[in-house]
Amino acid sequence: MANGTNASAPYYSYEYYLDYLDLIPVDEKKLKAHKHSIVIAFWVSLAAFVVLLFLILLYMSWSASPQMRNSPKHHQTCPWSHGLNLHLCIQKCLPCHREPLATSQAQASSVEPGSRTGPDQPLRQESSSTLPLGGFQTHPTLLWELTLNGGPLVRSKPSEPPPGDRTSQLQS
């Protein structure tokens, strides 16, 4: 019992403590304009939390161990995931495909202006022998990787349609 005088008698009075009192009077009319702000803040923070969890899971799925990435059993299913490490790929690819400045200038000065051979022509000849004609490599690559490696260039109109393409039959 609250007062402890008679433990057998029921206690019907109520005691008000300082914890239950509103020390600062709040006017409801002032809160009416902001009554949905708590709900909006809750849903925005919940959405931000879900997006953060999604990004963490996505990063964890990309960061596999180096042994797993280099193993022949590991095939990458998403060819667009290369594009997210674009600056790293460019830094890796550019030094191995560029010649020193002095040798490329010497080759460029010895070539006729109208000819198609240039400092990048040997790279195209070497890489065209490694790539199958009209096909992709065993691992999917992006178009910018193919052009950096000297692969096939993208043309606006192909010489012949891909197999199974019926658009040319519909036009005639």
Curated annotation (Swiss-Prot):
Residues 105-136, 151-172 are annotated as: Disordered. One of its GO terms (biological process) is negative regulation of adenylate cyclase-activating G protein-coupled receptor signaling pathway. It is found in: Cell membrane; Endoplasmic reticulum membrane. Signal peptide: none annotated. Its main location: membrane. Keywords: Cell membrane, Endoplasmic reticulum, Membrane, Transmembrane, Transmembrane helix. One of its GO terms (molecular function) is signaling receptor regulator activity. InterPro entries: MRAP. The chain crosses the membrane at residues 38-58. Expressed in adrenal cortex, testis, breast, thyroid, lymph node, ovary and fat. Expressed in adipose tissues. GO terms for cellular component: endoplasmic reticulum; endoplasmic reticulum membrane; intracellular membrane-bounded organelle; plasma membrane. Homodimer and heterodimer. Forms antiparallel homodimers and heterodimers with MRAP2. Interacts with MC1R, MC2R, MC3R, MC4R and MC5R. It is linked to Glucocorticoid deficiency 2: A form of glucocorticoid deficiency, a rare autosomal recessive disorder characterized by resistance to ACTH action on the adrenal cortex, adrenal insufficiency and an inability of the adrenal cortex to produce cortisol. It usually presents in the neonatal period or in early childhood with episodes of hypoglycemia and other symptoms related to cortisol deficiency, including failure to thrive, recurrent illnesses or infections, convulsions, and shock. Modulator of melanocortin receptors (MC1R, MC2R, MC3R, MC4R and MC5R). Acts by increasing ligand-sensitivity of melanocortin receptors and enhancing generation of cAMP by the receptors. Required both for MC2R trafficking to the cell surface of adrenal cells and for signaling in response to corticotropin (ACTH). May be involved in the intracellular trafficking pathways in adipocyte cells. This is Melanocortin-2 receptor accessory protein. The lineage of its organism: Eukaryota, Metazoa, Chordata, Craniata, Vertebrata.
